């Protein structure tokens, strides 16, 4: 026996079925009455050989109506913490969609690095991305990984700043949350003034930790706390 996600409105004693298929994921958007739905049904054959895609829609959890956002998304798709933006990947780039206007922006087009994990052995039509650390407070920016560093990029793509300096020494920097959020709680915003990083030297195999601190002109600085030889 399998169940579909639904919402029970206690004030009206109505139950709205949010899910329509077992081959989809439903993720409520915190602070709203909407949910992000990734529909896999049209691409089940491709998914069986590791080349899946999904159609992304917004479901209204009050009325049950659905609004299509993007078809055949071959990478990841998620909504920013405040529900303002859809973040998805396409063609080796990160894109945002303003959910109020439905305007889309390629936010990494002019960034002089690659966010694609070219060493992945994935058989999908598009190689996976290195991923993201998350969003900063109030959806001001999304923090995206390349092979070694973190980039702070605004949702309109107009500002892109590398906030670590790992490429020169081939040291991979990745954001880490020391105090994990409890079950069901949203992740804390990426803190570029007090947050922590894990470090790994891809050439030397050394590893350690570092910490962000506030720098000059709004640019954070990174200080190594631990940096150990391979054991």
What label would you give each PLM region?
Residues 1-231:
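Beta-propeller folds
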